[in-house]
């Protein structure tokens, strides 16, 4: 934080540095750089953040990890997926009224969708709606 305050850095680069900081703030485990975890970061924070985090890990490590390089290359070509379930669909198909309940259901569906690497079945959607 003080570094960002002390030196004149653009807001865009400040955001990039903060994203890297928050990613590494949590304890790093073997699952931290799994594709499913990086997909979660990719969806919520964007392509640039994932690439920055992977590149920082490559620069920080003492030996070359080809898996990280391949992950980095794979994220250069990816686009952020759109969630297949929309509010209109839930309102028409399941007769859910607009409001907090609809928002909560959409949020739970989105979390499940991201957790399953951007895949969700109709059965999973129905289970979430009925709970």
Per-segment meaning from a language model:
Residues 1-131:
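C-terminal subdomains that position terminal phosphate/3'-OH groups for nucleotidyl transfer/ligation
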């Amino acid at each position: 934080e003080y570094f960002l305050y002390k030196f004149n850095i653009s807001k865009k680069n400040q955001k990039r540095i903060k994203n890297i900081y928050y990613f590494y703030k949590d304890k790093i485990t073997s699952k931290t750089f799994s594709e499913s975890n990086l997909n979660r970061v990719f969806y919520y924070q964007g392509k640039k953040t994932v690439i920055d985090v992977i590149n920082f890990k490559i620069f920080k490590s003492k030996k070359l990890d080809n898996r990280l390089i391949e992950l980095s290359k794979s994220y250069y070509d990816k686009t952020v997926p759109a969630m297949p379930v929309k509010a209109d669909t839930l309102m028409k198909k399941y007769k859910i009224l607009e409001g907090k309940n609809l928002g909560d259901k959409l949020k739970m569906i989105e979390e499940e969708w991201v957790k399953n690497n951007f895949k969700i079945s109709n059965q999973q959607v129905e289970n979430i709606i009925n709970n």
